[in-house]
Amino acid sequence: MKRTWQPNRRKRAKTHGFRARMKTPGGRNVLKRRRRKGRWRLTPKVSG
């Protein structure tokens, strides 16, 4: 069976990146929550 983690930088950025988050109201809420919580990183590193 194929593993669930098949690294792909572009896919990662498109689904979890900052601009992807900013596009939707829900994504903006995620960023707001993470800012309020004081997270160092608002979005995951896109390092593949």
Swiss-Prot record:
Question: Does the UniProt entry include the keyword DNA-binding?
Answer: no
Q: Where is the composition biased (Basic residues)?
A: 1-22, 30-42
Listed name of the protein? Large ribosomal subunit protein bL34
Listed PANTHER family: LARGE RIBOSOMAL SUBUNIT PROTEIN BL34M (PTHR14503:SF4), MITOCHONDRIAL RIBOSOMAL PROTEIN 34 FAMILY MEMBER (PTHR14503)
The UniProt entry's GO CC annotations, sorted and at most eight, read: ribonucleoprotein complex; ribosome
Q: Pfam families this protein is in?
A: Ribosomal_L34
Q: Which additional comment does the entry carry?
A: The open reading frame (ORF) for this protein is entirely within the ORF for the RNase P protein (RnaP). The two start codons are separated by four nucleotides.
Query: Which taxonomic lineage does the organism of this UniProt entry have?
Result: Bacteria, Thermotogati, Deinococcota, Deinococci, Thermales
